[in-house]
From Swiss-Prot:
<dbReference type="GO" id="GO:0006351">
    <property type="term" value="P:DNA-templated transcription"/>
</dbReference>
<dbReference type="InterPro" id="IPR015712">
    <property type="entry name" value="DNA-dir_RNA_pol_su2"/>
</dbReference>
<dbReference type="InterPro" id="IPR014724">
    <property type="entry name" value="RNA_pol_RPB2_OB-fold"/>
</dbReference>
<dbReference type="GO" id="GO:0003677">
    <property type="term" value="F:DNA binding"/>
</dbReference>
<dbReference type="InterPro" id="IPR007641">
    <property type="entry name" value="RNA_pol_Rpb2_7"/>
</dbReference>
<dbReference type="InterPro" id="IPR007645">
    <property type="entry name" value="RNA_pol_Rpb2_3"/>
</dbReference>
<protein>
    <recommendedName>
        <fullName>DNA-directed RNA polymerase subunit beta</fullName>
        <ecNumber>2.7.7.6</ecNumber>
    </recommendedName>
</protein>
<comment type="similarity">
    <text>Belongs to the RNA polymerase beta chain family.</text>
</comment>
<dbReference type="InterPro" id="IPR037034">
    <property type="entry name" value="RNA_pol_Rpb2_2_sf"/>
</dbReference>
<dbReference type="InterPro" id="IPR007121">
    <property type="entry name" value="RNA_pol_bsu_CS"/>
</dbReference>
<dbReference type="InterPro" id="IPR042107">
    <property type="entry name" value="DNA-dir_RNA_pol_bsu_ext_1_sf"/>
</dbReference>
<dbReference type="InterPro" id="IPR007642">
    <property type="entry name" value="RNA_pol_Rpb2_2"/>
</dbReference>
<dbReference type="Pfam" id="PF04560">
    <property type="entry name" value="RNA_pol_Rpb2_7"/>
</dbReference>
<feature type="compositionally biased region" description="Acidic residues">
    <location>
        <begin position="1088"/>
        <end position="1115"/>
    </location>
</feature>
<keyword id="KW-0548">Nucleotidyltransferase</keyword>
<keyword id="KW-0240">DNA-directed RNA polymerase</keyword>
<dbReference type="GO" id="GO:0003899">
    <property type="term" value="F:DNA-directed RNA polymerase activity"/>
</dbReference>
């Protein structure tokens, strides 16, 4: 039934029936291999392409010979601390040859700091950890299409798409004429282009295409007689209005398609062309040849005759991946080509005798291109670091968006849909919900990238019905030709199929064939899904929509204080945690010499010592806590690759995103209506779901026009009680508890001298006292925040820290909060079953089992049937049995516990086979009417915490134009009393309440002050005035040239003034600063959308770059 499997240092009992024939690859190798290729070969290719650079006379030649990367200035951790980029200096050996004098100068030139990839597959840019996402783009090559014209006739098209350069398109019309478009200009008869290539006579052209009738029809439309005429005709289309000559036309055509500098098919484009057109052009020819153009047209004629088939753009054989290395190379190429221009210019300007390579080369364009890519490219993303799974998935993400890709608005249904070629390459489950659905995917577990950028999936070779252990990696194109059996096809011990007919896939079709017809077999049932999806037990019993939510929500689980690996796992937990890079691994065999919370020292068998420093309480990108704990003891033996310390969300080397809790599926007093969740106070008391969150605040002392700011303890008008936790410098001490409004860093800013009265001036003159004119600009704890100070960092110019211009001192304060689970927090299981906590109930009032154990969570049974995620029920049953047996179980996706296994395990544990039991009401002790499903389910606390969302405002910033409060928590805004709310008050006839809300509580500036005065003096509230937004409306209408006046009932014009003088007077009397409501930097109106910090760094929020090809091509 089940058997023990060793995962790391722990045992899991697995239900898997299928033998693993292939180890899963390293899960972040897609990033590492690509970057390594770039360092080893990509850079060399670039320098080879650009070298040599000659001046216009051909006299000076600049060659790039070799390059080397130096040592990075700071280590990874230090880079994060100092807010700098983790990079190494790139030095290039350059040779300058003067052909006139034969003089050769060689120099090593510094070409800027090049960002390095960390061992975890990320980059540190300005102290923030970022990931470069791989991009799915159309592969260069030739594509054939066929469509039905409105007249009902089939029309055909062929497009040759290069990596960079002009497009070449052939198309037919209703009369079977064949046209060509060069670089999206107007159509020409296709034979004009063929003639221009040197096939001058009609006879030659007809012969070239075996006297094809379509070519004959096209020749009749073709007015050109010779190659020269054809060249001129093409030139006229490409450069209308310029006088055509045969030479200029020839050189233009040469440059368009046959010049390697202007036209590049790339290695992959040449490979695809040769493969599709059955050519044998050498692979290093990356431009078009005459044969290519003729063969692509010939292939289209074949398609027109009814043979062959059109291409499917969404097939993964026609889409390739641009990973880090290639994306970086493209950026570097842009930088180098800009630099090349500068070098050429300088060669002509500078004096030949004193010229050196150093003088010629300007590295600024190269550095800028790289910086821009890492800092602001759509594919360079702030790493999702909520938990280890989020990190891992982010590095394996495949995006069809970004420069040169699709745009969200333009992408139709077909592009987003699951395609049969995704099998084993791209997960059909894991993709975001919302506008990016289907455009962003995740690499499958066993998928790997081949040198051409196509995703390959592994299969076991089958010879004459016998499955061998030979493993072949196939691209989507290659797989089309074969019949592939599923991984769960039953086999004999020597690898023959047991059944007489085998289920298989052949291209898009499912077939039932004899064993001899099978060519390949899947290596594993989980090869079609991604890592996150492979972590869902009983995935096969869940509806796809809910599985998608389950996979996505696991990435949002907050690392908990006490981790606990699931009782019911899938066996993937260990691999995911190990490859995510959050755990510490032993590099060689040895013995543990010392293991403390700070570090682990291992003595290797060869006698050397290795010290592993552990990360303690660091802030992740998302504000969750990164902390490592040793899991080995002194004198323990360790092997190479063994996990010796747990990171966040890991438990003994296994991924542990949540906790195992006892749940019951029942309704309870309406507290679990609409997916709400009722939890026991035990989860709060025993810190089941307590997590640590760390926020970072910084204060900088700058130079201002009136003098430098100063970080100090001496703050004007502040009592000693407020300063009690500040040290002598005015910076808060570590360990202090702070809450809203407390000073973290005392800082004063010089104020301009104010006008003094005569008396004051006299006193000043006598005593020589210059008033200390400073104002308090201290860093305080924002609204709604509180916690303990865990770390303080001070950076100053004197200590040689790199600070922004104008900043003399920078202080960073880290505040940690322990957040227990509370009402309003979002929780979820792994099956897309999410809900919000509606009530936390006393332990003694919760329903309890016959043995007196109270349940910990009560879920609504109605959440299961309509959503069809039965996996959660299976997990609950099996979890109960696992707890009773004291085991941890593994039920891998598509190869896990069957229904019978679950019943048998329940029997073995001595539990009722139905998985149901009588529950008793904790308040009365009476049994509930029916038996209830009870068991252990793995439940996660998600990053949508109520503490981050709850918000209240009394007085705060107002928008400058409308004078209405801003919106959103981030702006400390108010709650919008919107159109529908106004209707509600209108419906009740609550006229005065409504008037108040629309005027004095909002944007009647005069009324605001007068109302305040009335409240202070205890008088009646005065009549409201004119709202500011009404004045804005009038001004806008007047700006359109409309004469708008406001009349009273008696047709007298009402003058709408600016803020009244008397109000200003009154304000002075009351000591109110009318402008204090405006924050120091004026905040302009916030957008309509809700402000949620989580989405600030989300790729969905970033605007797409404009796309390069037009609608016709997208069709």
């Amino acid at each position: 039934m089940f058997y023990p499997v060793k995962v790391g240092t722990r045992e899991r009992w697995s239900y898997s029936r299928i033998r693993e024939v292939l180890d899963m690859p390293n899960l972040i190798e897609i990033q590492q291999n690509s970057y390594q290729w770039f360092l080893d070969e990509g850079l060399r290719e670039m320098f080879r392409d650009i070298s040599p650079i000659q001046d216009f006379t051909g006299n000076l030649v600049l060659e790039f010979i070799d390059y080397s990367l130096g040592e990075p200035k700071y280590e990874v951790e230090e880079c994060k601390e100092r807010d700098v980029t983790y990079a190494a200096p790139l030095r290039v050996k350059v040779r300058l040859i003067n052909k006139e004098t034969g003089e050769v100068k060689e120099q090593e030139v510094f070409m800027g700091d090049f960002p390095l990839m960390t061992t975890k597959g990320t980059f540190i840019i300005n102290g923030a950890e970022r990931v470069i996402v791989s991009q799915l783009v159309r592969s260069p090559g030739v594509y054939y299409s066929e469509s039905i014209d409105p007249s009902g006739k089939k029309v055909f098209g062929a497009t040759v798409i290069p990596n960079r350069g002009a497009w070449l398109e052939f198309e037919t019309d209703v009369n079977d004429n064949i046209f060509v478009r060069v670089d999206r200009t107007r159509k020409l008869p296709a034979t004009v282009l063929i003639r221009a290539l040197g096939y001058a006579t009609n006879g030659q052209i007809a012969e070239l295409f075996d006297d094809n009738e379509h070519i004959r029809i096209t020749l009749e439309r073709d007015n050109t007689e010779s190659a020269e005429e054809a060249l001129v005709e093409i030139y006229k289309r490409l450069r209308p209005g310029e006088p055509p000559t045969v030479d200029s036309a020839r050189s233009l055509l040469e440059a368009l398609f046959f010049d390697p500098k202007r036209y590049d098919l790339a290695k992959v484009g040449r490979y695809k062309l040769n493969k599709k057109l059955k050519l044998s052009v050498p692979t290093d020819v990356h431009h078009l040849t005459k044969e290519d153009i003729v063969a692509s047209l010939r292939q289209m004629l074949t398609l027109m005759s009814g043979e062959g088939h059109k291409d499917d753009i969404d097939h993964l054989g026609n889409r390739r991946l641009r990973s880090v290395g290639e994306l970086l190379q493209n950026q570097f190429r842009i930088g180098l080509s800009r630099m090349e221009r500068v070098v050429r210019e300088r060669m002509t300007i500078q004096d030949v005798d004193v010229i050196t390579p150093q003088v010629l080369i300007n590295i600024r364009p190269v550095v800028a291109a790289i910086k821009e890519f890492f800092g602001s490219s759509q594919l360079s993303q702030f790493m999702d670091q909520t938990n280890p799974l989020a990190e891992l998935t982010h590095k394996r993400r495949l995006s069809a968006l970004g420069p040169g890709g699709l745009s969200r608005e333009r992408a139709g249904f077909e592009v987003r849909d699951v395609h049969h070629s995704h099998y084993g390459r791209m997960c059909p489950i894991e993709t975001p919900e919302g506008p990016n659905i289907g455009l962003i995917g995740s690499l499958s577990t066993y998928g790997r990238i081949n040198p051409y950028g196509f995703i390959e999936a592994p299969y076991r070779k089958v010879n004459n019905g016998q499955v061998t252990d030979q493993i072949d990696y196939l691209t989507a194109d290659e797989e089309e030709k074969f019949v592939v059996a599923q991984a769960n096809a039953p086999l004999t011990d020597d690898g023959h199929f047991i059944e007489e007919k085998i289920d298989g896939r052949h291209g898009p079709d499912f077939v039932l064939v004899a064993p001899e017809r099978i060519d390949y077999m899947d290596v594993s049932p989980k090869q079609m899904v991604s890592i996150a999806t492979a972590l869902i037990p009983f995935l096969e019993h869940d509806d796809a929509n809910r599985a998608l939510m389950g996979a996505n929500m696991q990435r949002q689980a907050v690392p908990l204080l006490r981790t606990d690996a699931p009782y019911v796992g899938t066996g993937m937990e260990y691999k995911a945690a190990k490859d995510s890079g959050v755990c510490v691994l032993a590099s060689k065999d040895g013995t543990v010499e010392r293991a403390t919370a700070e570090d682990i020292i291992i003595r290797h068998d060869d006698g050397t010592l290795e010290k592993h420093k552990l990360l303690k309480y660091l802030r992740s990108n998302q504000g969750t806590c990164i902390n490592q704990r040793p899991i080995v003891m002194k004198n323990e033996r360790v092997e190479a690759g063994q996990i010796i310390a747990d990171g966040p969300s890991t438990d003994h080397g296994e991924l542990a995103l949540g906790r195992n809790v006892l749940i019951a599926f029942m309704t309870w007093e309406g507290y679990n209506y609409e997916d709400a969740i009722l939890i026991s106070e035990k989860l709060v008391k025993e810190d089941y779901y307590t997590s640590i969150h760390i926020e970072e605040y910084e204060a900088d002392a700058r130079d201002t026009k009136l003098g430098p700011e100063e970080i100090t303890r001496d703050i004007p008008n502040v009592g000693e009680d407020v300063l009690k936790d500040l040290d002598e410098r005015g910076i808060i001490r570590i360990g202090a508890e702070v809450s809203t409004g407390d000073i973290l860093v005392g800082k004063v800013t010089p104020k301009g001298e104010t006008e003094l009265t005569a008396e004051e001036r006299l006193l000043r003159a006598i005593f020589g006292e210059k008033a200390r004119e400073v104002r308090d600009t201290s860093l305080r704890v924002p609204h709604g925040e509180a916690g303990k100070i865990v770390d303080v960092k001070v950076f100053t110019r004197e200590n040689g820290d790199e600070l922004a211009p104008g900043v003399n001192e920078l202080v960073r304060v880290y505040i940690a909060q322990k957040r227990k689970i509370s009402v309003g927090d979002k929780m979820a299981g792994r099956h897309g079953n999410k809900g919000v906590i509606s009530r936390i109930m006393k332990q003694e009032d919760m329903p309890f089992l016959p043995d007196g154990t109270p349940v910990e969570i009560v879920l609504n049974p109605l959440g299961v049937p309509s959503r069809m995620n039965i996996g959660q029920v299976m997990e609950t049953h099996l979890g109960w049995a696992a707890k009773a047996l004291g085991l941890r179980l593994a039920t891998p996706v598509f190869d896990g516990a069957q229904e019978e296994d679950v019943f048998a395990t329940l029997r073995k544990a001595g539990l009722p086979e139905t998985g149901k039991t009588v529950l008793y009401d904790g308040r009365t002790g009476d049994p509930f009417d029916n038996k209830i499903t009870v068991g252990y389910m793995y439940f996660l606390k998600l990053h949508h915490l109520v503490d981050d969302k709850i918000h209240a405002r009394s007085t705060g910033p107002y928008s400058l134009v409308t004078q209405q409060p801003l919106g959103g928590k981030a702006q400390f805004g108010g709650q919008r009393f919107g159109e529908m709310e106004v209707w509600a008050l209108e419906a009740y006839g609550a006229a005065y309440t409504l008037q108040e809300i629309l005027t004095v509580k909002s944007d009647d500036v005069v009324g605001r002050v007068k109302t305040y005065e009335a409240i202070v003096k205890g008088e009646n509230i005065p009549e409201p005035g004119v709202p500011e937004s009404f004045k804005v409306l009038i001004k806008e209408l007047q700006s359109l040239g409309l004469d708008v006046r406001v009349l009273s009932e008696n047709d007298e014009e009402i003058e709408i003034r600016e803020i009244d003088e008397d109000v200003t007077e009154t304000a002075k009397e009351l000591g109110i600063d009318l402008h204090e409501d405006l924050p120091a930097p004026v905040i302009h109106e916030a957008g309509e959308g809700e402000d949620d910090e989580y989405f600030e760094e989300d790729e969905e929020a970033v605007d797409d770059e404009p796309m390069t090809f037009d609608d016709d091509d997208m069709e």
